[in-house]
């Protein structure tokens, strides 16, 4: 007759073969503890599943962070509060954004403030938090548009595939938005197309800029219509202003 220890060892081996090492280790540890016989069936199942589940969740979040180019970022929304060095306006806006309801609702966020005011910190903190539930990408706007133009020139098929992925992406973050003047008509068209498609699909986009939206049109040369359309979509919902006290 097979003993409890022999059966446990067999189950541990089978769980490892199934690619469930955390569950296997937990079963082995529980069986050798005094608590094993005191656990009811559901409690035992719960204790076996929890470590494996948490490991899978952690790996999924890390994969999302890596894809978003946010892996290893220390930024946290807990740090994005009013202080002596900076103020977030309107009042209470960081608490609203921390809920991430805007991602679910497909709303856009425009983060404004001078250089080193904390725009990137806030955007990355939102991105890191969003990766727990959503697919995110973080890009510097200028290099992002250059890469999209280059991809289109190399392979239109891959470019189209990337556009479709961007259209379905839960949250797109474009940092340093219009930091320099866009003179390439192809970049203007791509930026407009992405914002337009994402608005139609009700997907959230965050842009961070040192410049007031009223000056954006002058940063997009030779296409006033597209410039106005881009501004309208990027500032459609929430606008966050960061006042950095040390910059005033």
PLM feature spans:
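Conserved alpha-helical scaffold flanking the Walker A/P-loop in AAA+ ATPase domains
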Residues: 95-101, 150-172, 189-197, 229-230
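P-loop NTPase Walker A phosphate-binding motif
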Residues: 121-132
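Interdomain "pre-motor" coupling segment immediately N-terminal to P-loop NTPase/helicase cores
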Residues: 20-72
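N-terminal pre-Walker A segment at the start of P-loop NTPase domains
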Residues: 74-100
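Walker A/P-loop nucleotide-binding motif
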Residues: 105-122
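Charged, compositionally biased N-terminal leader segments and the immediate start
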Residues: 1-18, 24
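Short glycine-rich substrate-engagement loop in P-loop NTPases that contacts/grips substrate
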Residues: 86-94, 131, 137-167
């Amino acid at each position: 007759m097979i003993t409890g220890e022999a059966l446990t060892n067999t189950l541990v081996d089978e769980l490892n073969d199934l690619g469930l090492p955390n569950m296997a280790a937990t079963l082995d540890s529980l069986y050798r503890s005094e608590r094993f016989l005191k656990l009811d069936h559901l409690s035992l199942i719960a204790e076996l599943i929890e470590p494996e589940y948490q490991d899978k969740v952690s790996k999924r979040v890390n994969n999302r962070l890596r894809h978003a180019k946010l892996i290893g970022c220390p930024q946290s929304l807990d740090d994005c509060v009013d202080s002596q060095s900076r103020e977030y306006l309107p009042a209470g806006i960081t608490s609203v954004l921390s809920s991430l309801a805007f991602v679910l609702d497909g709303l856009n966020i425009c983060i404004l403030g001078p250089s080193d005011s904390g725009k990137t910190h806030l955007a990355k903190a939102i991105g890191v938090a969003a990766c727990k539930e959503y697919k995110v990408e973080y890009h510097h706007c200028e290099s992002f548009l250059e890469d999209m133009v280059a991809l289109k020139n190399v392979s239109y098929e891959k470019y189209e595939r990337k556009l479709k992925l961007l259209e379905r992406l839960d949250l797109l973050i474009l940092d340093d938005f219009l930091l320099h003047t866009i003179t390439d008509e192809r970049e203007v068209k791509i930026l407009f197309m992405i914002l337009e498609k994402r608005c139609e699909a009700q997907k959230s986009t965050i842009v961070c800029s040192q410049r007031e939206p009223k000056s954006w049109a002058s940063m997009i040369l030779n296409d006033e219509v597209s410039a106005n359309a881009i501004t309208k979509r990027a500032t459609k919902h929430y606008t966050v202003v960061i006042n950095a006290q040390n910059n005033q």
